[in-house]
Amino acid sequence: LPSRGLGDVYKRQLNKNIRVLEIGTGSGYQTAILSKLSRFVYTIERFKTLKLFSESKFKYLKLNNVFCKHSDGGLGWPEQMPFDRIIVTASAPEIPLTLLNQLSADGIMLIPIGEENNDQDLIKIKKKGKKLIKKKIMNVRFVPLLEGKENK
């Protein structure tokens, strides 16, 4: 997401008091940025090699507020909920209720919604108690959010 020109979204939506759930650690670049802008970052990666690679970088950089998990991102991290922010770096055909249920009462989720190999909408979902406020931010193209985890 940083490469998508969302610097202003980060600045307005993150602060040192919040807990972030990131779905899709990848190289850990975005995670490292999030760690400097929030209190805790819980990040899930479905590929074991990527999780181990990025986790070693976090240790080297002494990012002690980052916690990594090798798992199915669509399941979230229920043991650590609720999250003030959830950032999903893979597209889903619709908003995953499992993740939405892990969002705090005033939380915000950023997620690309749409079909694989097509334009998708990056959606900002703000939870106000039991009410959801959805806003399209921009058109994007992300890899799909896949079920399960890979041991490679």
Describe the predicted segments one by one.
Residues 122-152:
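Substrate-binding/catalytic lobe of Class I Rossmann-like enzymes that use SAM or dcSAM, i.e.
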Residues 13-132:
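Conserved nucleotide-cofactor-binding alpha/beta core module
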